[in-house]
């Protein structure tokens, strides 16, 4: 049942999400009726605290007044025209209204035409109303040059005694912009009135066609009229002509209607036939009044009317009196010019008659020429006198299109600052005007920097104006959104009596209209400007989304620094964010100024309906303006059919009567008023009984939960009578196994309807242990109780503004229920954990190192340490072998768990309480014989506890890892070369490497072959071979090589091979040449080819460094050369002599005789035996 009750309670509530403008109950001005709203603002009379909604309107038949004041009457907005506001004649092109505690200033830009001016003028008329909206002063700027005083005082830069005047906290502006201008259709009568207001100039030419004029002179008169009309048509687009010829008869050659066709009118002039006879000048002038300047012949009531009389003599036989015609009522307002041709006008009577025809003064209206050929010399002078040439096509414009009052600020009870955006060819400027003296001083950039006049042209300076309250001074600023096509903000600076605008901030994107809207903000409401918001509503990303730049003002020198950039919802293009901005006062009720920014085209063209436009609310903080909006109000959520929602806005005053600041937002044709919602800030408290849990406690805990409003207002009290506070309790937050819980789940989710004693609400709750023992594992850490809360209100309740919790205060509070601890009557037990660790070695060689030992000594020299834990982080290539633990305290460790690239082993030391004691632990790891990817790794020991004031001890050891390998070079060997067996020898030098390389260590084999000895090239390397494809070899010529410095060698051939395998044979084939080297061989007996293994010792460890060097020695063998012929001859001669001597001695001894006889006997015996054998064979 309680669950159903809770769900029903929640379902009947509407969550209050928007902070903190109430969009559920807006008020709108009547749609389709008077007035048609262009802009709106709120104004309050300080003397009576009466607040009105002021709206501006275009000039129509239904809304004749440009300003209306509106009030809330029985939940409806009723509007009435503000009386005694002068309405200037002409077509209204814009209305600007600003207010301060000094009053209200309304300026109307009016399109008018001066008499005989060739072009229209767009200037302003301003009316200053008092705080009670009674008229105080009026200023008309049609003749601005006569109102200027270049020596008028400018107060900027001086200390200003009253900072309230013109301050950003009580000045709100609203003005109609061209981009959103869409006036109601006007009645036909009004259109006719406006046409007459721009009716132009009507010129009636009266030509003397009497008989006293010769035909050639009459033709010259017609040519003069043609040239005059053609000359005027080129400059004056609104000039119309009529031509009347007089003599014996008076006839209209063509009237004002016919002159619309320029070429036809010029042709008619040339086709005129002279009528002759008498000179009826007075009758001809009366004819123009009766038959030309009438509406039936194309004349407009408010057009400027001019007569040009061309005659060759005095009046003759005219029935009408000239004086009577001149003084007739129809002649009033008609300017007359007279041209007398001929000698007759030298007489006094005829001259007086000519002056009577012309208007005063005669110097500029009566002309005399001696003959008709001299008429063309009068054209330029006549044109200048008839039509004022200032402001004509091609000429520079000064104040004709100034639009005085396009933007405005009230400075005090007599001075105003008015933007003149169109002055000086739209370079713009500002007018500092004194409403009492009716004098002003024009301020612009051109006067200050004539060299930069080209950049100033068309910059629209004065599009927006504002006043900054700097430290003990005022500063006038003006926006120029087209300055150098990027836009800029100008600040008025003084040098002596000179004052001019100079740029201080410039836009960053072409066409962004940077500076079109300025909004000074006094965040802390101390009277000094803290920030300046500068809008660039056409800033382009995908479309013209717009953005706002927030600049901070320096308190020291008043300089600007960019604080942040604001932008609207990224999903909308062409939103024009920043089109309007306003400081809204303290909407969030934190004594800080809030700001509203409009995006009137956001959602334009969307499919969800005809409403479009949004307003963003940004709250002020002590360190500045918030970076994100607290609320986005869309037109579609307010009312259907609202267009350009956010084109103007203002706030800061209470029109609804609830004591809170309200705001108004302008849309096309209507104004919307929103009330702000009371902001509630709650102070939450919680009391526990018992205040601390004893060890082994198994009872219930009484909880007293109270909510107290820290800031009570009438609106908040009224709203809280109907609001509900929904709160939720989360007991033992952050614990996987909770030790306490609510005795009844319903008591942890409450719908509270009544507040006790107005500002405080309390509730009693019960907490009880969960199933099992209350203190099974964690009996020492506090039990955290989190209270989350929110305000809710019944749906459809709009009688009072709905309260809302402060957006910037977390809607929850956390309270701690501690356990009792034996800590010498102190609130917290403070343990003092000390950790000391050592490792058996810092450098480990994979493949060589077998074990690593870490000794850990943990000491608690303080009070009890609860739930003491030790975390041991070590690299994965260390495998736990054994762990030596003391018998006391008890240490229990979990199995290591892989986390990322390490293993973590968690140990519980002396759980639950580690008393004052020490523990020594030894951890032994075995190093895996696998390649380790990193050069270093850390072993980290971290010890923590669960005391309220946690203790933390940790130590880290960094291990250096290298990988071992075995590489053996073949033993040194000797080779022999017989240098006497030819001039060159081909040799191959083999370097054999073998060993064990389990971890893919890369090492280098360097072979050094001496090639040049004493400047002679002895050895040339021909070829290099290797057996492994992975081996990469390079070679170069070096002057020194390897580890040995061998004498006589000047150059080496160095071969470097990178090897990563177990075995490799590298063979270097070379050619040894001895040509021209006989002298060298006298001193050089051998060559040494060197071989050496090297490697990166920071990565690898060579396990047999004694076998990393070898050499191959080449020994040279040398043969002696002898002259053999003399020795042979001498030996032969000596031998013969010795033989002869021996023979002589033997002969004398009879040696040869006995021997010879024996030989002969043996020969005879052999012959006989042979013969006997032959005979036997034959037989």
Swiss-Prot record:
Binding site for Ca(2+) 3: 654, 656, 658, 662
Effect of residue 208 to A: Loss of E-cadherin binding
This protein's record includes keyword Transmembrane: yes
Tissue spec. comment: Expressed on a subclass of T-lymphocytes known as intra-epithelial lymphocytes which are located between mucosal epithelial cells.
Cell location: Membrane
Quaternary data: Heterodimer of an alpha and a beta subunit. The alpha subunit is composed of a heavy and a light chains linked by a disulfide bond. Alpha-E associates with beta-7.
Residues in compartment: Extracellular: 19-1124
All ranges on the Cytoplasmic side of the membrane: 1148-1179
Membrane topology recorded in Swiss-Prot or TrEMBL: Single-pass type I membrane protein
Gene Ontology CC terms, in alphabetical order: external side of plasma membrane; integrin complex; plasma membrane
Residue ranges of every copy of the VWFA domain listed in the record: 200-389
Entries under InterPro entries matching the protein: FG-GAP, Int_alpha_beta-p, Integrin_alpha, Integrin_alpha_C_CS, Integrin_alpha_Ig-like_2, Integrin_alpha_N, Integrin_dom_sf, VWF_A
Region (Disordered): 158-200
Example of a GO biological process term: integrin-mediated signaling pathway
Transmembrane portions of the chain: 1125-1147
Protein name as annotated: Integrin alpha-E
Renumbered ranges of motif GFFKR motif: 1150-1154
Domain commentary: The integrin I-domain (insert) is a VWFA domain. Integrins with I-domains do not undergo protease cleavage.
Gene: ITGAE
């Amino acid at each position: 049942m309680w669950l159903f009750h809770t769900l029903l309670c929640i379902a009947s509530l509407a969550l209050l999400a928007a902070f903190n403008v109430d969009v559920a109950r807006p008020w709108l001005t009547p749609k389709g009726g008077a007035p048609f709203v262009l802009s709106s603002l709120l104004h309050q009379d300080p003397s009576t605290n009466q607040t009105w909604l002021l709206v501006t309107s275009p000039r129509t038949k239904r809304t004749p007044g440009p300003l209306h004041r509106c009030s809330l009457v029985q939940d409806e907005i009723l509007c009435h025209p503000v009386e005694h506001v002068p309405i200037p004649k002409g077509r209204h092109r814009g209305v600007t209204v600003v207010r301060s505690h000094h009053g209200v200033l309304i300026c109307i830009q009016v399109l008018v035409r001066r008499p005989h001016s060739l072009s229209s003028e767009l200037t302003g008329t301003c009316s200053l109303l008092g705080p009670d909206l009674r008229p105080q002063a009026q200023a008309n700027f049609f003749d601005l040059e006569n109102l200027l005083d270049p020596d008028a005082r400018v107060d900027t830069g001086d200390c200003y005694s009253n900072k309230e005047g013109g301050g950003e906290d009580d000045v709100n502006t609203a003005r109609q912009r061209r981009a959103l201008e869409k006036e109601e259709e006007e009645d036909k009568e009004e259109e006719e009135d406006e046409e007459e207001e721009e009716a132009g100039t009507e010129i009636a030419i009266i030509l003397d066609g009497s008989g006293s004029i010769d035909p050639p002179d009459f033709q010259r008169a017609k040519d003069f009229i043609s040239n005059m009309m053609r000359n005027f048509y080129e400059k004056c687009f609104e000039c119309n002509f009529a031509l009347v010829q007089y003599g014996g008869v008076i006839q209209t050659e063509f009237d004002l209607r016919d002159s619309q066709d320029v070429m036809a009118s010029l042709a008619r002039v040339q086709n005129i036939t002279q009528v002759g006879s008498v000179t009826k000048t007075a009758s001809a002038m009366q004819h123009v009044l009766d038959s030309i300047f009438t509406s039936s012949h194309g004349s407009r009531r408010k057009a400027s009317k001019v007569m040009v009389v061309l005659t060759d003599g005095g009046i003759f036989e005219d029935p009408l009196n000239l004086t009577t015609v001149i003084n007739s009522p129809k002649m009033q307002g008609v300017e007359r010019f007279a041209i007398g041709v001929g000698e007759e006008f030298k007489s006094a009577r005829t001259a007086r008659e000519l002056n009577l025809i012309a208007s005063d003064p005669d110097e500029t209206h009566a002309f005399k020429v001696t003959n008709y050929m001299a008429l063309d010399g009068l054209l330029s002078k006549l044109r200048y006198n008839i039509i004022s040439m200032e402001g004509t096509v091609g000429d520079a414009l000064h104040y004709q299109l100034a639009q005085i009052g396009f933007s405005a600020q009230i400075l005090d009870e007599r001075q105003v600052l008015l933007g003149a955006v169109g002055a000086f060819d739209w370079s713009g400027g500002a007018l500092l005007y004194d409403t009492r003296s009716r004098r002003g001083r024009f301020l612009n950039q051109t006067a200050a920097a004539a060299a930069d006049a080209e950049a100033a042209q068309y910059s629209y300076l004065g599009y927006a104006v504002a006043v900054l309250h700097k430290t003990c001074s005022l500063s006038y600023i003006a926006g120029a959104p087209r300055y150098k096509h990027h836009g800029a903000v100008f600040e008025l600076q003084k040098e002596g009596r000179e004052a001019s605008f100079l740029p201080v901030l410039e836009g960053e994107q072409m066409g962004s209209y940077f500076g079109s809207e300025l909004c000074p903000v006094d965040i802390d409401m101390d009277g000094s400007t803290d920030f300046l918001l500068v809008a660039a509503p056409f800033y382009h990303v995908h479309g013209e989304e717009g953005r706002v730049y927030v600049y901070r003002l320096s308190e020291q020198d008043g300089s600007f620094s960019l604080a942040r950039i604001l932008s609207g919802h990224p999903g909308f293009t062409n939103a024009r964010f920043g089109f309007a901005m306003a400081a809204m006062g303290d909407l969030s009720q934190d004594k800080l100024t809030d700001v509203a920014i409009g995006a009137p085209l956001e959602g334009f063209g969307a499919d969800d309906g005809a409403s479009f436009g949004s307003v963003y609310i940004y709250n002020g903080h002590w360190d500045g303006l918030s970076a994100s909006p607290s609320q986005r109000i869309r037109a579609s959520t307010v009312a259907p059919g609202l267009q350009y929602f956010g084109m103007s806005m203002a706030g800061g005053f209470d029109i609804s009567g609830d004591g809170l600041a309200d705001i108004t937002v302008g849309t096309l044709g209507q104004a919307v008023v929103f009330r702000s919602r009371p902001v509630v800030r709650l102070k939450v408290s919680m009391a526990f009984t018992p205040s601390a849990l004893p060890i082994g406690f198994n009872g219930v805990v009484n909880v007293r939960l109270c909510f107290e409003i820290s800031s009570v207002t009438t609106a908040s009290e009224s709203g809280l009578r109907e609001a509900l506070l929904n709160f939720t309790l989360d007991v033992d937050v952050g614990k996987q196994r909770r030790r306490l819980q609510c005795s009844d789940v319903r008591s942890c989710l409450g719908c509270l309807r009544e507040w006790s004693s107005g500002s405080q609400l309390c509730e009693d709750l019960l907490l009880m242990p969960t199933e099992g023992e209350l203190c099974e594992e964690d009996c020492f850490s506090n039990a955290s109780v989190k209270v989350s809360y929110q305000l809710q209100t019944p749906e459809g309740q709009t009688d009072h503004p709905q309260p809302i919790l402060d957006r910037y205060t977390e809607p929850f509070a956390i309270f701690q229920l501690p356990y009792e601890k034996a800590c010498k009557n102190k609130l917290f037990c403070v343990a003092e954990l000390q950790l000391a660790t050592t490792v058996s070695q810092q450098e480990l060689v994979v493949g060589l190192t077998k074990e690593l030992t870490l000794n850990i000594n943990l000491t608690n020299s303080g009070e009890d340490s609860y739930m003491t834990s030790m975390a041991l982080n070590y690299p994965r290539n260390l495998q736990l072998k054994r762990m030596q633990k003391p018998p006391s305290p008890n240490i229990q460790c979990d199995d290591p768990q892989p986390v990322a690239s390490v293993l973590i082993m968690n140990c519980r030391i002396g759980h639950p309480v580690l008393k004052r004691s020490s523990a020594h632990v030894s951890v032994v790891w075995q190093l895996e014989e696998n390649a380790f990817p990193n050069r270093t790794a850390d072993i980290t020991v971290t010890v923590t506890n669960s005391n309220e004031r946690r203790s933390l001890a940790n130590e880290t050891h960094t291990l250096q890892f290298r990988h071992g390998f075995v590489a053996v070079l073949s033993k040194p060997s000797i080779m022999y070369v017989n240098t006497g067996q030819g001039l060159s020898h081909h040799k191959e030098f083999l370097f054999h490497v073998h060993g064990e390389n389990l971890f893919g260590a890369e090492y280098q084999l360097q072979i050094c072959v001496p090639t040049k000895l004493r400047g002679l090239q002895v050895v040339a390397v021909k070829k290099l071979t290797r057996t492994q494809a992975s081996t990469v070899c390079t070679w170069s010529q070096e002057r020194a090589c390897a580890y040995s410095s061998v004498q006589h060698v000047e150059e080496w051939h160095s071969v470097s091979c990178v090897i990563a395998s177990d075995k490799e044979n590298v063979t270097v084939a070379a050619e040894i040449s001895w040509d021209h080297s006989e002298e060298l061989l006298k001193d050089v007996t051998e060559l040494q080819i060197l071989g050496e293994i090297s490697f990166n010792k920071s990565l690898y460890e060579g396990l047999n460094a004694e076998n990393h060097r070898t050499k191959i020695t080449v020994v040279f063998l040398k043969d002696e050369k002898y002259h053999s012929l003399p020795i042979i001859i001498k030996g032969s001669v000596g031998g013969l002599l010795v033989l002869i001597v021996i023979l002589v001695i033997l002969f004398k001894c009879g040696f040869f005789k006995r021997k010879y006889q024996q030989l002969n006997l043996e020969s005879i015996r052999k012959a006989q035996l042979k013969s006997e054998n032959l005979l036997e064979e034959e037989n």
